[in-house]
């Protein structure tokens, strides 16, 4: 959510107050921890113990983050948004937007189901196949239309594997023309991949306090006596949206 300068600071300025209460994923990149929480992003510098939040006001291109992943070879954090837009964040805080996939008009299902790193590349498993992102060059290198949804992918030996819950496991030799669907052959049954955060990174992330409200969902707000009162919620058990708890939040100064 965004509130105006009357609450947040100087006249004519804006400040985002995003929720970071629900930790979803933690990545380590150099001396920093990058934390995806409540679909928002912040980092923790282990050298000086500083916390930095990221949003559209201070550099990001979009909001509602779906996946993050650190690419060690390119020394960049890959940020994939729910609308399929992509940002690359380096360890100095510089952001490079890669909007090509987001802007590309396709008749297939573009939904990104997961991301996997190999060298300087990030492989996006999508609703139609795999998209290969060159993280170092900040460009889309290739797109492999397999005509089935891919849940996750990985490289092992001289092969790239595409795991699909609906179609099973497929693979192709890295030396083959991966654009040619006939080079992808069945390699077994689909196996659910369990992704768990490193316990030590999660434990440290739980000690951090980047601030912000409990929830990003605001149903009603009112400004009274230099305080911003708000109610969250919109919880729907049928939609299983537990990230929208019923809550009353009060902002005074910069503190919730």
Residue map of PLM features:
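Structural signature of WD-repeat beta-propellers
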Residues: 36-38, 81-82, 90, 125-127, ...
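Short, conserved, GDST-rich strand-edge loop motifs in beta-rich repeat architectures
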Residues: 230-246
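Short glycine/acidic-enriched loop and turn motifs that connect beta-strands
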Residues: 41-42, 84-86, 129-131, 167-170, ...
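Beta-propeller domains
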Residues: 36-56
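Short coil-to-beta transitions that initiate beta-strands within beta-rich domains
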Residues: 7-29, 55-73, 98-118, 141-157, ...
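Short loop/turn segments that connect beta-strands within beta-propeller blades
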Residues: 45-49, 90-94, 134-138, 174-177, ...
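Bacterial Sec-dependent N-terminal signal peptides
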Residues: 1-13, 121, 159-161, 172
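Conserved beta-propeller blade signature
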Residues: 32-35, 76-79, 121-124, 159-162, ...
